[in-house]
């Protein structure tokens, strides 16, 4: 007797600045879940979270996927945020969040699934939350002895009055040198990041980031190669081959990251002997330090001259678009897209 397909509830969109990236990622994941043997294994029901945080069922979710961008809902709703699960959710056996940024990658949705006592793809509440907040993440990396570029952490409230603001600017200039990068602590995909080269740009960058997040980080800029490694599994983590992102822009900003032709990837990266192994090992150590399981993409900086390797960040729900490194790294490691999403769903039930 044939077993019935497992019903996957795929959640995408979300109340975050990476809403449209999530729509593109969801399209790729759904394609993988409906390809090859997966077409017999799984029944996929998409659920859409709009930019006000409201959940929508399969019919409207499919319309958003077809348009590849947010569209007007079929009827107006005055309330914002989550109120109840849409129709069709009662049949879901495994949840698959394809949400990037706050309110999706930060442990909030994972907590909902955990309260529902239903399996879900990806990291749990703790790993998701710590990985989302760059200051908490950096503290965990430091505790694990992983090398990082110098940085200064602060709160947006530190910029409140002129005296405190000047003190913050003086502190950053004393501990770092230009250029440096100002980042909101809880956004991804380079959203809200500024490269600053002087005090005026630093102040402007801090004000911009403070509008997006109450916690900020300023990192030392380094002239280094950008390397990435993918991680997969739950009880037994494994790392992929190492890839490199190359670009002609001044830095790897949102436009460069998501516009075709503005960046290229080299997989596997051409590295001196032993460097790839260091990246792969440190990627696993980073996941262990933050309690991350399921999947992750871990990013590094590498200096060709000094041979210094710095861990940059970890993404627990990495992009799954046609230009995203996570699926490409596994493809180069011998794991096709349909195999990859199958393994991710399997890991949810481990």
Curated annotation (Swiss-Prot):
Boundaries of every ATP-grasp domain copy: 138-346
Subcellular compartments: Cytoplasm
Catalytic activity field: 2 D-alanine + ATP = D-alanyl-D-alanine + ADP + phosphate + H(+)
Pathway the protein takes part in: Cell wall biogenesis; peptidoglycan biosynthesis
Cofactor(s) the protein needs: Mg(2+); Mn(2+)
Keywords assigned by UniProt, alphabetized: ATP-binding, Cell shape, Cell wall biogenesis/degradation, Cytoplasm, Ligase, Magnesium, Manganese, Metal-binding, Nucleotide-binding, Peptidoglycan synthesis
Chief subcellular location: cytoplasm
GO MF annotation, one: metal ion binding
Function: Cell wall formation.
Family annotation (PANTHER family): D-ALANINE--D-ALANINE LIGASE (PTHR23132), D-ALANINE--D-ALANINE LIGASE A (PTHR23132:SF25)
Protein name: D-alanine--D-alanine ligase
Native source organism of the sequence: Synechococcus sp. (strain CC9902)
């Amino acid at each position: 007797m044939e077993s019935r397909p497992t019903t996957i509830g795929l959640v995408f969109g979300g109340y975050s600045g990476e809403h449209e990236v999530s729509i593109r990622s969801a399209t790729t994941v759904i394609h993988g879940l409906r390809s090859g043997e997966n077409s017999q294994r799984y029944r996929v029901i998409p659920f859409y979270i709009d930019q006000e945080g409201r959940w929508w069922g399969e019919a409207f979710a499919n319309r958003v996927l077809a348009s590849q961008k947010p569209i007007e809902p079929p009827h107006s709703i005055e309330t914002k945020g989550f109120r109840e699960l849409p129709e069709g959710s009662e049949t879901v056996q495994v949840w698959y969040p394809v949400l990037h940024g706050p309110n999706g990658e930060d442990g909030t949705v994972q907590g909902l699934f955990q309260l529902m006592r239903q399996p879900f793809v990806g990291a749990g509440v703790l790993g998701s939350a710590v990985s989302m907040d760059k200051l908490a993440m950096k503290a965990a990396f430091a505790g694990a002895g992983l090398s990082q570029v110098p940085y200064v952490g602060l709160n947006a409230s530190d910029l409140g009055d002129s005296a405190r603001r000047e003190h913050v600017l003086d502190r950053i200039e004393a501990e770092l040198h230009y250029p440096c990068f100002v980042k909101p602590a809880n956004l991804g995909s380079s959203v809200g990041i500024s490269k600053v080269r002087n005090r005026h740009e630093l102040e402007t960058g801090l004000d911009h980031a403070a509008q997006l997040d109450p916690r900020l980080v300023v990192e030392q800029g380094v002239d280094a190669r950008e390397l990435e490694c993918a991680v997969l599994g739950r009880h037994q983590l494994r790392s992929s081959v190492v890839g490199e992102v190359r670009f002609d822009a001044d830095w790897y900003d949102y436009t460069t990251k998501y516009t075709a032709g503005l960046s290229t990837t080299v997989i596997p990266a051409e590295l001196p002997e032993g460097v790839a192994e260091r990246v792969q090992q440190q990627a696993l150590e980073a996941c262990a330090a933050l309690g991350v399981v399921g999947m992750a993409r871990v990013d590094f900086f590498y200096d060709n001259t000094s041979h210094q390797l710095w861990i940059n960040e970890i993404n627990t729900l990495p992009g799954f678009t046609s230009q995203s490194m996570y699926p490409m790294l596994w493809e180069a490691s011998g794991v096709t897209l349909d195999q990859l999403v199958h393994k991710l769903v399997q890991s949810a039930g481990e």
